[in-house]
């Protein structure tokens, strides 16, 4: 089994870290204290470079997401709004971001935000049981709601787009993952993934080109892998639970991340970071580490690509971001 080794630990907040996202060398983080902090991640250098205006939101920052290949950031808050931030062009090359827009529409806390691969759709989800899809242009200044999806029966915890297709997955307190697709400008639910026996906190798509698989993490302490099998005559998609990953977690699984390297990482209430590898069609534990944030729960995990190296980042209730390397056993 490989080892998981701590590279760097950054104490960013006094309260819990809910979410972060990485793009173009910058890790954006969101916390209960309403602040969004940006960390420059380069080689072995991890530096806090900006703290965004905390007056933009009245409550916790629950989710942050970079628009692909840009310096535009979306942040969803418990105050039911979404803020959009853009990098300010400065002569002295300092990194600063300005508030570009506030998006309103949800009736309750926004739990998740996610950009489509082309950057023209922004999906948001909420405690109000709905998923909203917003359309924007290249500037990212104006947002039009083109669809409100209300088929979940409970709080929607998380949204994620397929890495190359206009396919959206939403995870919910109703124990399901729903798959959404655009048919002639009409977004429809094309599949309901049933199997988890508790809240589904998050999901992530396989990054392999041309492949349609999804992993999900739940209150039932399991991580599952789902596979798309095809469409039926009514254009509904058939997804099957291809695997339940080895039993590592003893409590809720809050976040999962499927890396470009094919590995799946999971974290949760038990403080364990687990990494799984598929070998000849069977999933095995590649590495695991307990107490990654001491006695605190872990809310988020991400794969980071740095100059040809792949590392992991985790964020917990302790307000700390930890960066980890994976070392294969000799």
UniProtKB/Swiss-Prot annotation:
What compartments host this protein?
Cytoplasm; Nucleus
Q: How does it assemble?
A: Interacts with NAR1.
- Each WD repeat occupies one of these ranges, namely 12-49, 56-95, 105-144, 151-190, 195-236, 248-286, 292-330
Q: Name one GO biological process term.
A: iron-sulfur cluster assembly
Query: In the UniProt record, does the keyword Membrane occur?
Result: no
Gene3D superfamilies, from UniProt?
A: YVTN repeat-like/Quinoprotein amine dehydrogenase
Recorded protein name is Probable cytosolic iron-sulfur protein assembly protein 1
Q: What does this protein do?
A: Essential component of the cytosolic iron-sulfur (Fe/S) protein assembly machinery. Required for the maturation of extramitochondrial Fe/S proteins.
Q: Which UniProt keywords apply?
A: Cytoplasm, Nucleus, Repeat, WD repeat
Which species? Answer: Saccharomyces cerevisiae (strain YJM789)
List the Pfam families: WD40
Instruction: Name the family the entry cites.
Output: Belongs to the WD repeat CIA1 family.
Q: Which GO terms describe its cellular component?
A: cytosolic [4Fe-4S] assembly targeting complex; nucleus
């Amino acid at each position: 089994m490989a080892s998981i080794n701590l590279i760097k630990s950054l104490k960013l907040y006094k309260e819990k870290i809910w979410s972060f996202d990485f793009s173009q060398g910058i890790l954006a983080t969101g916390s209960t204290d309403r602040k969004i902090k940006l960390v420059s991640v380069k080689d072995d250098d991890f530096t806090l470079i900006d703290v965004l205006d905390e007056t933009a939101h009245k409550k916790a920052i629950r989710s942050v997401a970079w628009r692909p290949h840009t310096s535009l950031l979306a942040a969803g808050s418990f105050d039911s709004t979404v803020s959009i931030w853009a990098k300010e062009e400065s002569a002295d090359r300092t990194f600063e971001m300005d508030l570009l827009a506030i998006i309103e529409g949800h009736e309750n806390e926004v739990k998740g935000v996610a950009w489509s691969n082309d950057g023209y759709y922004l999906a948001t989800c909420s405690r109000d049981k709905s998923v909203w899809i917003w359309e924007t242009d290249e500037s990212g200044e104006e947002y039009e709601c083109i669809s409100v999806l209300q088929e979940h029966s409970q709080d929607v915890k998380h949204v994620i787009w397929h890495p190359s297709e206009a396919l959206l997955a939403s995870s919910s307190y109703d124990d399901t993952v729903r798959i959404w697709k655009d048919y002639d400008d009409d977004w429809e639910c094309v599949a309901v993934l049933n199997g988890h026996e508790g809240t589904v906190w998050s999901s992530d798509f396989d990054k392999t080109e041309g492949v349609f698989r999804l992993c999900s993490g739940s209150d039932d302490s399991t991580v599952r892998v789902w596979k798309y099998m095809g469409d039926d005559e009514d254009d509904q998609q058939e997804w099957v639970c291809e695997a339940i990953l080895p039993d590592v977690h003893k409590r809720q699984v809050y976040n999962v991340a499927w890396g470009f390297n094919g590995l799946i990482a999971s974290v949760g209430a038990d403080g364990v970071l687990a990494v799984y590898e598929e070998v000849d069609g069977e999933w095995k534990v590649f590495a695991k580490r307990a107490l990654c944030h001491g006695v605190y729960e872990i809310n988020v995990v991400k794969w980071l690509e740095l100059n040809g190296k792949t590392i992991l980042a985790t964020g917990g209730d302790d307000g700390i971001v930890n960066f980890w390397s994976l070392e294969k056993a000799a």
